Regions:
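PAS/PAS-like sensory domain cap-loop motif
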Residues: 44-55, 117
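Sensory-domain boundary/capping and coupling elements
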Residues: 9-11, 15, 135-150
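PAS/LOV-family and closely related PAS-like sensory domains
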Residues: 52, 61-107, 115-117, 121
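Sensory-domain boundary capping and coupling elements
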Residues: 109-111, 128
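PAS-family sensory domains
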Residues: 120-130
């Protein structure tokens, strides 16, 4: 495989990136420094139930359970101030999230802070997957194990 560093290569890379963003089954969401949604892919629509038109420009509170918001925004501000997460690079975070219909789901995600051309923090991108079924299976297994110990 060769790499064309010219315009054709840039166009091909742009087309490839757009295809990945639009066809990923995982939610890919980008938000600005204030936590307003800048990008919302079809995977995010599938997982959370909001289409892009509903999500763009909205606060991430859209998908964050109310009692977790203060903690979320504390971490978000830390990343925006420092450019680094308290979690290691590539670590999966597991948290509850909200769907449009109000149901809680469990998601795993990674975050990627992004900067502008001047090196200033501009926002955060996240790749998320719904792990609700796996979380519920683990909870059921723990209950069964606890019941057998009694």
């Amino acid at each position: 495989m060769t790499h064309d560093a010219g315009k054709t290569g840039s166009l091909a890379n742009s087309t490839l990136l757009e295809a990945i963003l639009q066809t990923s089954s995982e939610a890919i969401i980008a938000s600005d420094a204030d936590g307003r949604v800048l990008f919302w892919n079809p995977g995010a629509t599938r997982i959370f139930g909001f289409d892009a038109a509903e999500a763009l420009g909205q606060s991430l509170d859209l998908i964050i359970p109310e009692k977790l918001r203060a903690r979320h925004w504390q971490g978000y501000r830390h990343v925006m101030d420092t450019g680094q997460s308290r979690y290691g690079e590539g670590d999966l975070l597991s948290v509850p999230a909200l769907r449009k219909d109000g149901t809680r789901i469990s998601v795993e995600f990674t975050i990627v802070p992004f900067r502008n051309a001047s090196g200033q923090m501009e926002g955060i991108a996240a790749v998320m997957r719904d792990v609700t079924a796996r979380f519920e299976e683990l909870r059921a297994l723990r209950r069964q194990l606890a019941a057998k110990k009694e």
